[in-house]
From Swiss-Prot:
Comp. bias regions, Acidic residues: 451-462, 492-501
Gene coding for it: SETD5
Low complexity: compositionally biased ranges: 565-574, 635-650, 1089-1104, 1251-1260, 1285-1307, 1336-1373
Residue ranges of every copy of the SET domain listed in the record: 269-390
Known function: Chromatin regulator required for brain development: acts as a regulator of RNA elongation rate, thereby regulating neural stem cell (NSC) proliferation and synaptic transmission. May act by mediating trimethylation of 'Lys-36' of histone H3 (H3K36me3), which is essential to allow on-time RNA elongation dynamics. Also monomethylates 'Lys-9' of histone H3 (H3K9me1) in vitro. The relevance of histone methyltransferase activity is however subject to discussion.
Protein name per UniProt: Histone-lysine N-methyltransferase SETD5
Any Pfam family matching the protein: SET
Length: 1442
């Protein structure tokens, strides 16, 4: 390709353009004519693409043959030469299409074109100052060699022309040459063998390339000049005529070269001025053949002269340390370079040094520039000739090799290099640079080999090498070699050994390497873990073991294979005294560090460096779940790690433990048996490991254990710090899983679901725990549930419910998370977002049904809750709420609040003002009712009073509600509503899901989907967990909103203000659908819902009279919480249940239905899942829901539903029936509120979780929610049996699921019908929904809320709810189970909530049942349940206390 073109000749341009693609003269030969060649070159785009080096000068460079008359050997190397072709080209005629589709001619076929090309080259060569003899010596050979050279540098397609192999190499710079020059020793650089070698990006490839460049290059007798350089020279000559016609300089250069060094004999300089010496396996240096005086012309640096930008077109140089390229910029400021990688002379071996003894000077002869090396100082014989760095080494991303004495500590290059003292084991420049580009596998392989070799060498030579210089560990550096040429043989031997080892290593099975890499990754992780844990162990244990000491052995183990790890441990034992330094590096030091440490107290940084990348590459390669899990565990142990770090720092100097002991500690700390580890150490570390094992935050077991431990340690915290509010939005979002209750962090809801789903594991445990030191604020995982259960069983009783209610209430109002986490860390444990979503959706669905029940007039105020019914219907704004905000004001206000929280965030937002007004009005009416309610509250309070949980809220609410019930009710209602809304907002996505559930309440798919989630298994627990969490949140809500009246108060007054602002965004389509469904529910199930609501309100008031009277929310929350012991609540609840009966579904229906429509419209509008949610739940769910809604509207749910509902109603109608219904309704009501529902589901979840989960899994669309799942499951089952009432059935299923455990035990009779038939589901699920919706909300707001409900409906609900709370609730969800043992606890709230919900939702459900599937069941039960679902869905129920 180097075609010599006379200066000024335009043909240079032409030739360059022809060869612009980097085509070689060969390519020209390939085509019969130059034009063909140009065409071919135009087609060389392939090669051009390969060689990003478009502007390489070689296109116009005079062919070496022309310029230099390349020797025949070069010709042979060339693909053109028959020999080279024979070697590189197939024996058969290669004529044919190249890969690019271009015609390729073999040598025989190219005879004519070759002659032409040779003639052209000759003519061009004549124009060039280079000797003609060289050109004449090897025309053909030169053509191909030059072509090869060009191809290599230009990456032109000529390689394609010559041989198929050429096309193979795609290395931009050398691919063509590789293809052709493989046979030629000097051009092997681009030979196929080189192509087969690894890429330059890999260490092996780079080393091979350097070897080829070092040993196989074409001797340059003259320079090859690129067209650009020629143009620049021409311009320069024109501008400075003085230099023209001075051949003497050239003659001098040639004479010097001839006299000194330019013979093609071998790679060493044969003449006196210079001698090439091999200093390393692939490195040679230029030594002075004799003493050289100052300014002596040592040698001309020959090669391909081109502009620097041409060489750097490929951008390779600063990626790799090209050793044979000289950069020069002192010629008129022109940046040029001489590329001697494949074409050059011995000057190419000159190395750069920070203390050069020679410099490059340019001379111009015959119009051509010559770069010569002049001595700038006297150079003694055999001294290395070095020049200054001609490039900015600081820009090189690889280790730059400096020729200065290795002992030079002032070398800026060595200082710059990370491991200046160490040269890479392989050719120093290439090895480091290649690390980055090296493939992970190769890098890991290479590092493993290096480490193994080093480990072996260090182990074998620990005593000997410990005294040796670290450099010996690696192949002696170039400097070393330069200084000690005699070491070359040793180095070569070492290199050979290394190569063999590399081969052996490469032969290692992939499994072995993978295992080793995995082992290293785990060891590294374990080491880190040990670092954190060991300080604690040291502080805890008497043995003072330096983590660094132990880590060093561990590191060695990590880096060496299992057998090697032991050896490395022994080695590290030797090095341990000096190991303290390696503490930070231990992972990187690994086996190398240990070995080198044995050799050298301070391991070389390079060994550490190689080992460092390998762990990284392996970790990245083997980014297994286990590794991630370890990482998460590390994060979870972050706090401990910090302590450990401090301990490490303190004990860093304490490397007193024997290496074995340290190794054992490391391994044991890693939970990995360490062979030969000290039993004592192991035991110590084992204890620490056990301690650490319990700290894995991502492990459910760990979470539960930690949470329980924290709770056990800090169970008193809720009482002490009821308001522990965490304002950290991240913590709140992750820990509470997007509790919207955090007023200060409204964006929490935007927290990624995965954040919540992982229980905010992303927040370092140290961050999370400091925020949640009490342990109640721990991750919201099953451990929360477990804690909730245990706490519900122990702490609820231990901590006054009122206090807990207060805490929850305050926390919810201020920061839902803090008090919840404090009091009901279990219940408040943030639900996983999906769980919350499902719960919310389910609740929303319920809310959709109970919208009218939320508004049900108090016609069925019945027994003790005429006020409840009255508040339900007495709220002036409640009616409005029913219309627009009825849920907020409906007697099911709690449910509405829950609904609001669940789904109608937007709705509430929309209704906020009205709600506030309505709430005020409702509070007034509620206060009026409270006049009655105080009696209820008092009666309930007397029942609830025993429950401490009711204490603060209950007591405060009760007395104050009795006295200033209105204010308290308003305040409590507002707070409860806020809390409830916060919960709902927090679960807004969840609400959307529950909404979807509610929306799809009748949809069998919904039921199916929910069951599917339940099938998940986790879904049920998760839902239960969500329910618990919601309960915690809903406790506050429940306080005010738990009782139907209280709920209304919450909705009417405080709830609306808080919930409305946080509207849940819903797609327009979804909004319209929800609105339509709400309307449908109002129309079809409106009467039922209203009646149910009224009945629920009445029953709820009856059940939570004290709650409702004292305060819609505050008192109710207290009351509900007080009934944490469901029994107490239940005795009032019994009355409430009577009231529920009084509010027969038909009555409730009539009233609730009317109310339910507005509410349901609103609630369903917001509670109905978004289109996305619907899609999520299943496209058919909305249709089923609509059909179910229509059926509900028609009041013709499946006969089974109706009969079942009627059955259930009849059961309540019976002496026990009311109780059962009350319990069921209470639970159903509770279920309706997302929190209540969640909690109810939890209740159901523990004992019934299995069954209900299964049912819900099959029927519930929101299977993801364990809590909802149970209810949904039933609902779905009901729905499946009666698809026509699918909406109602889905709703009832949800209800059933919600209260399943509590409600089912409460209304076992009616539940039994539900079990088999849609009707049964309808009745029971509604009861469950009410319980789940209301209970979670009421119980979440306060365990008292649930008890409050239960208090009023104590007689009916007390037995069954308490029973279900304790038994079924417990069975339904272990969290609830735990709570159920603590009826007063928030967990038990579900039951009390269930009671109150039963009362309150009895009306709701009645309305819902009547209007939907529930009407068939029986006016009372059906309506109540149906109302519940509506409210639960997202009408007023969510905004209210649902």
């Amino acid at each position: 390709m180097s075609i010599a073109i006379p200066l000024g000749v335009t043909t240079s341009d032409t030739s360059y353009s022809d060869m612009a693609a980097g085509s070689d003269p060969e390519s020209v030969e390939a085509s019969p004519a130059v034009n063909e060649k140009s065409v071919y070159s135009t087609h060389n785009y392939g090669t051009t693409q390969r060689h990003g080096c478009r502007g390489l000068p070689y296109a116009t460079i005079i062919p070496r043959s022309d310029l230099n008359g390349l020797p025949s050997p070069v010709e042979e190397r060339c693909g053109d030469s028959p020999n080279s072709e024979g070697e590189t080209v197939p024996t058969w005629c290669p004529c044919g299409l190249s890969q690019d589709g271009f015609l390729l001619n073999c040598d025989k076929c190219r005879g004519m074109s070759r002659g032409k090309v040779i003639r052209l080259h000759r003519r061009k060569q004549d124009n060039i100052s280079g000797g003609d003899s060289s050109a004449t010596e090897s025309w053909d050979e030169e053509l191909s060699p030059s072509t090869v050279l060009y191809t290599a540098t230009q990456h032109t397609p000529t390689s394609i022309t010559l041989t198929v192999r050429r096309t193979k190499p795609k290395k931009r710079k050398k691919s063509p040459e590789k293809g052709r020059a493989a046979p030629k020793t000097k051009k092997i650089k681009n030979s196929p063998s080189e192509a087969q070698n690894l890429d330059e990006n890999t260490t092996e490839g780079w080393e091979n390339r350097i070897r080829l460049w070092t040993d196989q290059y074409e001797e340059a007798f003259t320079n090859q000049y690129s067209a650009d350089v020629q143009n620049a020279l021409e311009q320069h000559l024109h501008s400075s005529k003085e230099f023209v016609g001075k051949p003497t300089i050239l003659d001098t250069i040639n004479k010097t070269e001839l006299a000194c060094n330019n013979t093609v004999i071998g790679s060493q300089m044969q003449l006196q001025l210079g001698r090439v010496t091999r200093v390393q396996k692939h490195r040679k240096i230029l030594r002075a053949a004799r003493d050289l005086a100052l300014d002596t012309l040592i040698i001309e640096y020959r090669g391909k002269v081109m502009l620097r930008q041409q060489f750097e077109v490929n951008g390779h140089f600063f990626k790799k340390p090209y050793p044979f390229v000289l950069f020069y910029s002192k010629f008129n400021g022109v940046e040029m370079c001489v590329d001697a990688r494949t074409f050059g002379n011995d000057a190419r071996f000159i190395r750069r040094s920070c203390t050069p003894n020679a410099e490059v000077r340019h001379m111009i002869a015959d119009g051509m520039i010559h770069l010569c090396i002049y001595a700038v100082s006297a150079i003694t014989k055999d001294a290395e000739v070095t020049i200054a760095f001609d490039y900015e080494y600081s820009n090189c991303n690889y280790k730059v090799d400096c020729a200065c004495h290795k002992g030079n500590r002032n070398c800026p290059i060595q200082k710059r290099n990370p491991n200046a003292t160490e040269l890479p084991l392989l050719p120093p420049p290439p090895s480091l640079p290649t690390i980055g580009a090296e493939t992970r596998r190769r890098k890991a392989r290479r590092k493993e080999l290096e480490m193994e070799q080093q480990n072996e060498a260090s182990e074998e030579n620990n005593d000997q090498q410990s005294q040796e210089v670290p450099e010996k560990v690696t192949v002696s550096s170039d400097h070393e070699e330069v200084d000690n040429p005699e070491e070359k043989p040793e180095e070569e031997k070492e290199e050979v050994i290394d190569d063999q080892e590399n081969l052996a290593h490469s032969r290692r099975t992939r499994e072995d390497r993978k295992v080793e890499a995995i082992m290293h990754a785990f060891e590294n992780l374990e080491k880190r873990k040990k670092r954190r844990d060991q300080p604690l162990e040291q502080s805890n244990s008497d043995v003072e073991i330096t983590t660094t000491t132990s880590e060093t052995p561990v590191g060695e183990e990590t880096k060496t294979e299992a057998p090697e790890s032991e050896v490395s441990n022994s080695v590290s034992n030797v090095t341990i005294p000096s190991t303290p330094q390696s503490v930070g590096v231990n992972t990187r030091r690994s086996s190398q560090a240990g070995d080198i440490a044995a050799e050298k107290l301070v391991p070389k940084p390079p060994p550490a460096k190689p080992s460092r990348p390998r762990p990284k590459s392996r970790i990245s390669r083997y980014r297994t779940s286990s590794a991630q899990r370890l990482k998460r565990q590390k994060q979870a142990n972050a706090q401990q790690a910090e302590l450990s770090q401090a301990a490490l720092e303190e004990g860093g100097s304490n490397s007193l433990v024997t290496p074995t002991e340290a190794g054992s500690l490391d391994s044991s700390g890693e939970n990995r048996p360490l062979t030969g580890s000290d039993p004592t150490v192991v035991s110590i570390t084992g204890s620490h490991v056990n301690r650490a094992a319990s700290k894995y935050p991502k492990t459910k077991k760990y979470l539960v254990t930690e949470w329980l431990n924290d709770k056990a340690e800090k169970q008193e915290c809720p009482v002490e710090c009821p308001l522990r509010i965490t304002t950290d939005p991240t913590v709140l979002a992750t820990t509470l899983n997007m509790l919207p209750g955090l007023i200060h962090s409204p964006l929490i809801c935007t927290t990624p679901k995965h954040y919540i789903r992982f229980g905010s594991p992303f927040i370092p445990e140290r961050r999370r725990r400091p925020l949640l030191p009490d342990g109640t604020f721990s991750s919201c995982k099953k451990r929360w549930i477990k804690q909730a259960l245990e706490e519900g069983m122990t702490q609820t009783s231990s901590v006054p419910q009122e206090t807990r209610t207060q805490h929850l209430y305050q926390s919810n109002e201020n920061s839902s998370s803090s008090s919840i986490c404090k009091d009901n860390a279990d219940l408040l444990s943030p639900l996983k977002k999906w769980k919350s979503r499902y719960l919310m959706e389910q609740n929303v669905t319920k809310l959709l049904r109970p919208l009218s029940p939320v508004t049900p007039p108090p016609p069925n105020s019945g027994s003790k809750s005429p006020q409840l019914a009255t508040p339900g219907s007495s709220h002036p704004g409640e009616e409005e709420c029913r219309n627009g905000y009825s849920l907020m004001f409906s007697p099911v206000t709690s449910l509405t609040t829950a609904s609001r929280c669940n789904t109608p965030l937007q709705f509430e937002l929309c209704h906020r003002k009205d709600l506030d007004l309505a709430k005020v009005g409702y509070l007034d009416s509620n206060t009026n009712s409270c006049a009655d309610r105080p009696s209820l509250l008092n009666s309930g309070h007397s029942d609830l009073a025993p429950h401490p949980s009711l204490g603060p809220t209950s007591e405060t609410g009760f007395p104050s509600r009795s006295g200033d019930g209105h204010q308290t009710l308003v305040r409590n209602s507002d707070q409860a509503f806020r809390t409830e809304f916060n919960l709902m907002y927090a679960y807004s996505p969840l609400n959307a899901m529950p909404r979807a559930d509610g929306l799809y309440r009748g949809s069998p798919l919904v039921g199916d989907r929910k069951p599917l989630h339940l099938d998940g298994g986790y879904c049920s627990p998760a839902e239960g967990f969500s329910s618990r969490y919601e309960h915690g949140l809903m406790k506050d809500l429940s306080r005010g909103s738990l009782s139907p009246g209280g709920e209304r108060a919450c909705e009417g007054v405080p709830s609306a203000p808080q919930n409305p602002p946080q509207r849940k965004k819903v797609s327009l389509l979804e909004y319209r659908k929800r609105k339509q469904e709400a309307k449908e529910n109002s129309a079809g199930g409106g009467g039922d819902s209203a009646q149910s609501k009224s009945k629920s309100a009445g029953a709820g008031q009856g059940s939570s009279n004290s709650v409702s009277d004292t305060g819609a929310h505050g008192v109710q929350g207290s009351s509900a919480r007080t009934p944490s012991s469901p029994h107490k609540k239940f005795s009032p609840s019994h009355s409430s249940m009577s009231h529920l009966e009084a509010v027969s579904p038909s009555d409730s229906r009539g009233t609730s239905s009317s109310h339910c429509r507005p509410q349901e419209n609103i609630s369903s509008r917001w509670m109905v899942p978004t289109s996305v949610e619907r899609l999520r739940e299943g496209g058919s769910i909305p249709k089923v829901l609509r059909s179910s809604v229509r059926v509900a509207q028609k009041g013709e749910p499946s006969p089974t539903w109706e009969s079942n509902i009627t059955e259930k109603d009849s059961d309540p109608a019976d002496g026990e029936g009311p109780e059962t219904l009350s319990s069921a309704l209470s639970k159903g009501a509770t279920v309706y509120s997302p929190s209540r529902y969640s909690y109810q589901l939890l209740q159901c979840d523990s004992p019934r979780t299995e069954s209900q989960s299964l049912l819900q899994q099959s029927s519930s669309p929101f299977r993801g929610h364990p809590t909802q799942s149970p209810g949904y499951s039933y609902r779905t089952t009901a729905l499946r049996p009666g698809n026509p009432p699918s909406h109602g059935s889905s709703e009832s299923s949800l209800s059933s699921t919600s209260y399943s455990s509590p409600a089912h035990p409460v209304s076992t009779d009616s539940l039994a019908p539900f079990t088999g038939t849609p009707g049964y589901f309808s009745s029971q699920p509604h009861s469950g929904n009410s319980t789940g919706s209301n209970l979670p909300r009421r119980s979440c707001p306060s365990s008292a809320a649930s008890p409050t409900l239960q208090g009023p409906s104590d007689s009916p609900t007390s037995d069954s709810v308490s029973q279900s709370s304790t038994g079924t609730l417990s069975s339904t969800s272990f969290p609830q189970n735990s709570r159920s043992s603590l009826p007063s606890d928030l967990r038990t709230i579900s039951l009390p909530s269930a009671g109150q919900s039963a009362v309150y939702q009895a009306s709701r459900v009645s309305a819902v049942s009547n209007s939907q599937h529930y009407p068939h069941r029986g006016s009372g039960g059906v309506h109540q349940y149906r109302l519940q679902p509506l409210q639960g869905s997202g009408v007023k129920t969510q905004t209210g206390l649902s």
